[in-house]
Each structure stands twice: as structure tokens, then as C-alpha cells.
Amino acid sequence: MERSGTARQPQLLGQKKDKFWLTVGLCALTAALFFLPFYIIEGGFFHYAGDFNSQQISFYRYMNGFIKGAGYPDSAFTSVHNTFSWATDLGSGVMNAYSFYLYGSPFFWFSLLFPQGWLPYLMVPLLVLKFAVAGGGAYLYLRRYVKNIDYAVLGACLYTFSGFTVYNVFFNHFVDVVALFPYLLWSLDEALYNDRRSWFAFWVAVNLVNNYFFFIGQVVFLAIYFICKLSTRDFRLTAKKFGLLAFESLLGAAMGSILLVPAMLSILQNPRTIDLSSGWGFLTYSKVQQYLAILVSWIMPPDSPYLTSIWSEGVIKWTSMSAYLPLCSLAGAVAYWKAKRGDSKKRIVGTCAVFALVPILNSAFYALNSSYYARWYYMPVLVLAAMTVNALENHNTDLDSPARGISWLMIATVAFAVVPVQDSDTGSWSFGVLKNPGQYCAVLGFGLLGLLLYRYLCQKWRSDSRFAQRMTAAVLAFAFLFSVVHIGIGKFGQWYTDSDLVKQDTNALLLKNDLPEGDYRVDTYKIHDNIGMWLDKSCLQYFGSTAAPSILSFYPALGVKRDVRSEPELSNYALRGLLSVEYLITTPEKQTDLENEADDGWEYAFAKDGYAVYRNTNYVPMGFAYDYYLTQTEYEETAKATRANLLMRALVLTDEDAAVYGKYLTHLPEGRREELYYESYVQDCRERRATAASVFQMNNSGFHAEITLEKENLVFFSVPYDDGFTAYINGQEADIVEVDEGLMAVLCPAGENSIDFVYQPDGIRLSRPLTLGGIVVWLAYTAYFVWRKRRTKRA
């Protein structure tokens, strides 16, 4: 006999129609309403804070044009097009740089229907679409677990407007994952309970292509989900069912591998992996506050991503740490937990709670990434939504006592506001350890107000036939109010720094057409992130996590921090000559600061389009030769502070490459490794400029250069090394040498040389046929089951 709250065949139970589109519409309308005030205030160009402003708007606008062929021209040497982005840091393969952000997102590809110039104004409509899609998917999943379809609508709204989703508007592309995941879980249920074929493979592929990084966590969660349901005998597992499920899993992975294989090969070169040096780091977090923050994140509305209300220690900011359900918190889920025994949902959520509290298990959702994140919470949130609506639908469940208990837990956090604190320097006493009291009061107020309204509705309307509808209305109203406040806190908290964002971005589009012609890099000074993307220029200041991995070794070797952004300080003047920076851009308001801080190598060029532009008098065109080299071992023995100066004088070769290519250069004498001053840097730039290529042309698949050499020599290009590059010298393929711990050089003969570097993502030759083959197999597989179903019906 079927137990209440377990899976069942989706039924309409005599109702006139399904409510999928109603759910989609409600979620879209609510999202549109809470974005509307900001949309109106800003004239349609919605900007938020942090990553949304610096990355998401810039990435969507830039990539819309890049895919359509705007910007750098096609290469005349090859038929390969649109594979390499010069505006991404020092230059990066576009597939690997953006597959984490948007390259596989169906929402991004949908945005290509619109002109590039529209994209900054379409960020809100696209977010509304994502919320709508999330609601539809959650409804499809949840309707299996309810008797009254209205509770599926309610559960879908709880999931769609959870604290996790609203929090991650800040990151934008995380909402894509929230939107698509319910369809994956729905398709798994369809395969397990209804023996429905092909849908699971399809949604595996879609979720994998959408975001390979989040897909790793989805695989872990699906394993937990499957095992927990199997352990409670929610479905009957046969060898045939398991075999078909395994086949569809592999088939979906094959169809989605178009981005996966290149991304994995790129990630293997990325140093942001788990630190295996600490056994305790596997099992415990280093700060007690981390545990408290995790527990509170499941019951209280979230803080703004970059502001913490309480916590002063631990990794809290930007981690997406929230599993809060709007209005209800965990009240309904706890009520369900108390009422059920041996239930699969309880086991799923319980297992996820253990994973959240153990570092090594938590990091399993991110391929053992060493950085702490909670960006997988959206998956148990969907199960929590199911538990909540099951508890609300069952009139025998005690709803009030869990709500009271959670209210008291929320109130207990007031202790952080009143605990006495003694100043270690002055000895004076004060009260409270709150970091942002105003935000804390707002979060606590919404949490308590939500539970108060939840209890009122349950007490007054629970026996009413329209209880689910009333609760849905209350949840949506609460979600609207909280989302406006949450986004407002984050947005206006940075208003003093971001109020001129739109002006700078739009002015950069004007400046793009007024900059001198040529293929060179630029630098910026005290202006907003990623302006280089609006200029379509390679820029030393870049904010993005997934640029070419070799950049993450090149910069640290120079003492320049490179985690999620590149921002070498202006004082590192030699880096500008090495990387062929010709112009530096700032605003008129910052000119005085720039001139006081900069070295003598910058001269004022012109002011236009709201910017002041300076020219680098030590500019060296890209593509030049050296007289000297030193080994990487010798290089690593030098002071990091002057290594950029050293790189203008000598090429750095690995010990192995020095044995092969050292004969074309002179080993740098020890005495010349120390004369590293500004004056000697100017002379080194002059010497490198004398050997520079006469032609250097950037294109959307790499670059073309022409150079005349007096003797056979290595020609250096300050382009990040990547296994996806193939070099051609005078039409003949040539070996690429990794130099300077992350850049490239190629050996050219004496005389005139035509050099072409062509980029295709490493692994694409494997992933492309794998994906195409997978699609062909899936179409045949689907066609077979459609044919069999029709034949059965006719029989």
C-alpha cells in the first residue's frame, strides 16, 4: 500500500486542467514585480553589485557580439573562427573561459536572438524567464508527490523563490542551474517510477552543457537521491531498469560532452584544487562560526552575498549559503520529519546535512575544490519544498510546534546582538558582535514575520479547500517583499561605488571607436571592472575565474596575486612593456591620482568620451626576439619584485627547453640579473622594440605576425600558453615553447617569417564527434520507444 507523501503517478484528481503554465506564470509575474522598481529607477539598465555588474552584464553583452562575429576579424589563414577571445584577460580560449558562465546556457543562446546592444537591458527579462522555467520544472517534479495539484504549485513557488535563488541573482548564471535542475530530477523519477525512456538522457545532457561545474555536484546528489530512495524501497529496481538508467546516464554525458572534455583538460591545469596537506581539514572547518553560519542559513533568510550580519570568521561571503524557504523556513519540513519514519526524503535531507558539515564531503560537490562553497544547496531545497507541501497537505501533521521551535531559534540569534564584548586595546565594554545590525534586523524581522504569517494561515485556513492557494499567495507576497529588500540592501550598499557604472560602460562603447587603430593591450586605472570587454581590447585589469590556466601560473611567479581577478598594480611598470600595453585609461577625476602614482613612462594622449587616455612611452609591439635567456630554476631564485624587469631582458626557459633552444640565445650573465632599474628597463624596451614584428594582427582564432630575423631565433608572444594552440611558420606546423612560466614562443628561421597561431580547444576533436554520435544514438533510441508505444496503443 502506498504511503502518504511518497511517489505516485501524476494525477489531476478530477480537476479541470493541469497547472504547469499557471505555475510558470505566477513565478514569472512575481519575479518581474520585484525587479520592476529597480528596472524603472535605472531606465532598464539594471545593475546590482559585485559579480553581476562586473561579470554578468559584461559577459552577456560581449559574448553576444563575439558569437555573431563582431570584433576581431576572421583569420585569413584558417577556416577556424570564433574560438579565441582577446578581451578575456591576456587572451583566452572562449569555450573554456565561458563554459562556466554562459557558453552552454540555453538562456544565453536564446539571448542571441536579440542585438548585442540590447543585452544590458535584457538582463532582468532573462532573469524573469529563468525564474519561470524554475517554477515549471519544480512543479513537474512535485506533482508526483501530492494529491491536490495546488500543493505542487505551492512547492514550486517555495523552490523558485528560496533564499538560495534570490541570493544568487547576484551571480546570475547560478540561477540557470536552479532553473534546469528540477527537470533532471523529474526525468529521473519518470525513469524510476514510470519506466519512461529518453527524457533522463536528454536532461542529463542539458544540465551538463549548461554548467559542467555544477553538474559534478548534481551527479553526487543524484547518487544520494537514488540510494536513499532505493533503501526505502520507493521503487522496484530490476537489472533491466538499472541497465537502461546507466545507459541513459552515459548517453546523456556523451551528448553533453561538447564542453566537458575541453573544460576538464583546462581544469587539470588550474591550481585551485583541494589542499591534501591537512587531514583535519578533511573533517572539520577551522572556525566554529562556520558551523553556526551553516545551521542558521537553513532557517533564516540570507544576508546579501557580500555583507554578513553576524559572522566575523569563517568563509561566509559569496558562498551562496542559504537553504531558506520563503515564509515557511524549515517549519513544514521539520513537521514532515517528525511525522514520518523510514522516509526517503528524510534520508536525502539528512545525508545532505551531514555533507554540509564535513568539509571533504561538502567539497565533493565541486570535484574537491579547495575553496568553500555552499552552491549545491538548491538541490536539497527542492526536497525540502516537497517535504513542506506534504506536511501542509496532511491534516494530521502537527504544523505549529515546529514553527514555534524555529521561531525561538531565530530569536536566540539575538544573543549575538547583546553579548558583552571587551575591547582588547582600551578595556572598555560594549554589547553585540553584529557586523551589520541593520541587515540583521531586516533578516530576523522577515524570518519571524514569515513564521508568524505561516502559523496564522495554518490555524485559520488549514481545513479550507483553498488553503494551498492562500498559502501560495502568501508565499509569493512574502517572496516579493523580501526580494526587493534583499536586492536593495546589496544594491544600495555599493551605490556609492557603482552609481557611475552605466555611464562608464556606455562611454567605453564610444571610446572603442575613438582609440587609435592597432592591435595592442590597454590598462585601466581606478575604473570599473572589465571595461576592456566594452572596448574589445585585451586589458590587464580583468575579473573572471576561468581565464586561460597559464595566467594563474604566470602572474603569481611575478608576485602578482591571481585568484578570481587579474589586477597588477601600476607600480609594476615593467609588466606593461612586457605585455605590450600601449594605452592606459582612467577618468578625469582620477587623473591627478594617476600622475602622482605612475612612473615616467606614461604621457597624456587625449581626453574623450568621459575618459582620459595616456600613452605608454615604453610600449613594445607584440612579437619580439631576445638576445639572452635564463633557466626557470635561475629565474625562481630571483626577487619576485623585479622579475618583470628581468623578463624584458631575457627569455625564461625550462631546464629541458634550455638544453634544446639555449643554443639560439646567450645565457644571461649573473651580473646582468641584478641591474634592474627603471632606466635599464627603458633600454631593454628599446632593444626589444628593435626586434619586434613588423606586423601583428589579432583575429578571432588567434593571431598573425610577420617578422624578419637576422638569425634563427625564438620569437616571443605575450599570449597565455594553451595546448589548444597550433603554430605555423611560413605555412609549416611548428612546436610551441612555453616560456616565462605561462607565455609562448616559437622558433623561426633567419629572414622573413609569416607566423600564424590558430586556436581550437584542446579536446574538441574528441568531444565534438562524441556529442554528435550521442545525439544520433539518442534520436534512434527515442524513436524506437515512440514507435513501440504507438504500436502498443494500436494493439
Model-derived segments and spans:
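Soluble catalytic regions of membrane-associated enzymes that act on cell-envelope
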Residues: 113, 471-713, 717-725, 730-735
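Active-site-proximal, structured, solvent-exposed surfaces of multi-pass membrane proteins
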Residues: 5, 10, 14-16, 665-795
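Membrane-embedded helix bundles of polyisoprenyl
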Residues: 27, 131-144, 150-231, 244-264, ...
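Active-site lumenal/periplasmic loops and adjacent helix-entry segments of GT-C-fold
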Residues: 37-145, 150-182, 206-210, 293, ...
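Start-transfer (signal-anchor) and selected internal transmembrane alpha helices
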Residues: 1-40, 244, 452, 466-476, ...
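Periplasmic/ER-lumenal interhelical loops and adjacent helix-loop junctions
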Residues: 53-57, 61-76, 106, 241-242, ...
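Membrane-interface helix-loop-helix junctions at transmembrane boundaries of multi-pass membrane enzymes
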Residues: 234-243, 333-356
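Contiguous transmembrane helix-bundle modules in multi-pass membrane proteins
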Residues: 194-195, 214, 345-506, 752-795
